[in-house]
Amino acid sequence: MGGAADMRKKTKDRHSWKTGFTTGSCAAGAAKAACLLLKGLHQGTEVDIPLPQGERLQLPVHRWDRVEDVAWVSIIKNAGDDPDVTHGLEVVARVQLLSQRGEILIRGGRGIGVVTKKGLQIPPGESAINPVPRSMIQAAVREVFPQEEILVVIEVPEGERLALKTLNPRLGIMGGVSILGTTGIVRPMSEEAFKNSILPELDQAVAYGHKAIVLTPGNYGFKVAREQLMVPEEAIIQMSNFVGFLLEEAAYRKIEKVLLLGHIGKLIKVAGGIFHTHTHVADARMEILVAHAALAGMDQNSLQTIAELPTVEGAAEEIRSKGWGSLLFKLAERASHRAQDHVHGELQVGTAFTLLNGEIIAWDDPAMEIGKEFWHWPPVEEEFWRK
């Protein structure tokens, strides 16, 4: 086992690309720095915040000021080597002390989008500040004001203009950008750099003797694999958008079985034969879902309702509520068939779809068999949703 452990250390050392930080980290850092300013503490050029996974992050402060009982600070978004339209964006937090005891109230101001459609992580009518960034803001503020009632208003001065370059208008998020992030860190997704960093991880899985691995797009699937399926960390490969590439490389390394595990909005593309899942390359998620629903015999009104929903997750929940849960299982099966065809049958592939909350909502028989054989398959209400 020592050799494999050494390989893990070398693998991490080879990651030479630059990471960045999310808009969620910017908002949390600006909020904490503004609280320090409001409290009369020294305002330096950097601010230190806690991250969701227990690490800490130092962020450079861009501008700041205090007018009477309101303090504001801005931080410039740095996406590192990741190609991100929000790179260089100024994120502002304005804070005000309301009372000596109470909650932290988080609001979206100028340049923050407002959710207008259901099916997203934030309900309609609320500012598009996602749950993890909200938690990060609260944790950062509480390091300065442990129990006080604080109003935090997040603003992005260029948000309304920049939002037109994002998916927000299509998702029904109007008037600005979203505050996003699940870890606080932006990890580069440039193709060559990212692919080169993943291949040693596959080699590592082989060195550990794993005949089966999990391929997942990112952090959500990684968490499900670790916590629900009990998959060893070195057998979980975060593939980003490069499904076809990772399937080919896994087959080349004589790995026998692969579980595709991740959010339905990403992996449903594989059911349509899409093996590079970045939105700018191919985005037929809803079209694939509606087409298969029509082939299964769903009525026209239901098809119209599903097609008008802003996200695949919302559509999947609507499908389940209408008693068509079996369709999602068939789509998982279809994704596995397309994946196996992609590598000419050199791998056995199973597919499992999740929601953002980690619930496994659909899978095919190979996915369950791989899970039971190598790791753990959580008790789920299969027969209920297959109906």
Swiss-Prot record:
Keywords (A to Z) from UniProt: Cobalamin biosynthesis, Methyltransferase, S-adenosyl-L-methionine, Transferase
Record-level Gene Ontology MF annotations: cobalt-precorrin-5B C1-methyltransferase activity
The EC number(s) this enzyme carries: 2.1.1.195
Entry-linked SUPFAM superfamilies: CbiD-like
Pathway assignment: Cofactor biosynthesis; adenosylcobalamin biosynthesis; cob(II)yrinate a,c-diamide from sirohydrochlorin (anaerobic route): step 6/10
Catalytic reaction(s) noted: Co-precorrin-5B + S-adenosyl-L-methionine = Co-precorrin-6A + S-adenosyl-L-homocysteine
An individual GO BP term: anaerobic cobalamin biosynthetic process
Enzyme class: transferase
Record-stated family: Belongs to the CbiD family.
NCBIfam families (UniProt xref): cbiD (TIGR00312)
PANTHER family for the chain: COBALT-PRECORRIN-5B C(1)-METHYLTRANSFERASE
Name of the protein: Cobalt-precorrin-5B C(1)-methyltransferase
